[in-house]
Design a protein with these regions (language model features):
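Divalent metal-coordination and catalytic microenvironments
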Residues: 4, 20, 30, 79-80, ...
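A short helix->loop->beta-strand "cap" motif at the edges of active sites that frequently abuts
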Residues: 25-26, 95-97
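Active-site-proximal beta-strand elements of phosphoester/diester hydrolases
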Residues: 3-8, 27-30, 142-149, 167-172
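Pre-active-site segment of Zn-dependent metallo-hydrolases
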Residues: 15, 25-76, 90, 115-120
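Conserved P-loop/Walker A NTP-binding site and adjacent catalytic elements of P-loop NTPases
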Residues: 32-39, 78, 102-103, 109-112, ...
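Di-metal (Zn2+ and/or Mg2+/Mn2+) metal-binding site signature of metallo-dependent hydrolases
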Residues: 69-95, 103
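Metallo-beta-lactamase
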Residues: 104-156, 162-164
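Metal-dependent phosphodiesterase/nuclease catalytic metal-binding core
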Residues: 19-24, 28, 156-172
């Protein structure tokens, strides 16, 4: 079984979040902001929390994957734009899973964490574009490729998740 959960970013520009669910494992691709909501919120509120962000619909509504939260094994980030990486400081902690991103995207994420005085328990791994690596599932390892692609920010990658059912490509 391969099930794709379109959590955010499919009916609007922003709040990008996709989850690929397999029998025993699941993987997050991007957790981003809806920027117009962030701008209006920053004009009113100085402190951002997940609850406030969800109230103004600035982050993905991940309640649709609450039943598979314990299956999340990794979080992959495709590039450094805020609509793909911006909500990680506020939402990633609830998933006991490491974060994988390119070095530039990791620097942007580190800045977001510092700006919001947030320390994540998740390990963050910088992976160079055009690199393959393995992530641990419940009973198997999965090969992942970070494939360099062209975009309006540096170190953008298409992510290839190799599963027993085939390769899932993510290039949102």
């Amino acid at each position: 079984m391969v099930k794709i959960h379109t959590v955010g970013g499919y009916s609007e520009v922003g709040k990008n979040m996709t989850v690929v669910e397999l029998e025993e494992d699941a993987f997050i691709f991007d957790i981003g902001f809806f920027l117009p909501a962030i701008v209006s919120m920053e004009e009113r509120d100085k402190v951002m929390t997940e609850k406030r962000l969800k109230k103004v619909k600035a982050v993905p509504d991940d309640s649709v994957i609450s039943g598979i939260k314990d299956k999340i094994r990794a979080q992959f980030i495709g590039h450094a734009h805020l609509d793909h990486v911006g909500a990680i400081p506020f939402m990633s902690d609830k998933y006991n899973a490491p974060i994988y991103a390119t070095p530039f995207t990791c620097e942007v994420l580190d800045s977001l964490l510092l700006d919001n005085d947030i320390i994540l328990d998740n390990k963050i791994f910088a992976v160079k574009p055009n690199t393959s690596f393995y992530v641990k599932g419940k009973n198997r390892k999965y090969k992942v490729d970070f494939i360099n692609i062209t975009h309006s920010t540096v170190q953008t990658v298409m992510i290839a998740l190799h599963t027993p059912k085939g390769v899932v490509l993510y290039a949102n």
